[in-house]
């Protein structure tokens, strides 16, 4: 079990960002962190430990994005000991992430990372690609990294 501080530092190193931005309203608060990644561009890290209703941690960003022209990559880190890493709630969270990507094209990317899983390395690589795409100039940039 890694602490939130260690997990935040580790993800910052993996993604090439520093999670030191002040929370924006209630975003990036106790369950996560924010990093500035450019002009009106942010990387958010949400660490999911309980996994009771993970979709709530995702949905909190939607109104924030709707009210502005901000761009965001959300890295949703699911702890190894989180309950129900698979199942209907996990599937709903992934579906809502995909829906937000469609409704907010070029402005939002959802990157789920299941810590300690066989797919973790590929998931981190996809998140890193999304962060790099976020840093590119707005014209000619795909937030989804060619996906």
Q: Where would I find each of the regions flagged by the language model?
A:
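Conserved catalytic cores of phosphodiester-cleaving nucleases, focusing on short active-site segments
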Residues: 32-34, 40-51, 64
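Catalytic centers of nucleases
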Residues: 23-37
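Phosphate/oxyanion-binding active-site loops and adjacent basic polyanion-contact surfaces
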Residues: 3-4, 53-57, 123
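Hydrophobic/aromatic beta-strand patches that form the interior of the parallel beta-sheet core
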Residues: 43-45, 73-75, 111
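Acidic-basic catalytic patches of nuclease active cores, encompassing PD-(D/E)XK
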Residues: 1-25, 146-147
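Alpha-helix C-cap/termination motif
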Residues: 14, 37-38, 67-71, 102-106
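Catalytic cores of nucleic-acid endonucleases
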Residues: 50-99
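Domain-level recognition of nuclease-like catalytic cores that cleave nucleotide substrates
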Residues: 81-146
């Amino acid at each position: 079990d890694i602490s939130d501080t260690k997990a935040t530092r580790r993800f910052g190193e993996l993604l090439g960002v520093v999670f030191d931005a002040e929370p924006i309203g209630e975003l990036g608060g106790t369950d996560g962190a924010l990093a500035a990644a450019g002009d009106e561009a942010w990387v958010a890290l949400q660490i999911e430990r309980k996994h009771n209703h993970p979709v709530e941690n995702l949905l909190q960003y939607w109104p924030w994005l709707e009210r502005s022209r901000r761009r965001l990559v959300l890295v949703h880190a699911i702890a190894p000991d989180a309950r129900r890493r698979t199942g209907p709630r996990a599937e709903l969270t992934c579906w809502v992430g995909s829906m937000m990507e469609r409704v907010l094209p070029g402005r939002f990317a959802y990157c789920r990372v299941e810590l300690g899983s066989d797919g973790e390395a590929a998931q981190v690589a996809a998140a890193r690609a999304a962060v790099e795409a976020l840093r590119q100039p707005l014209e000619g940039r795909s937030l989804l990294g060619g996906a």
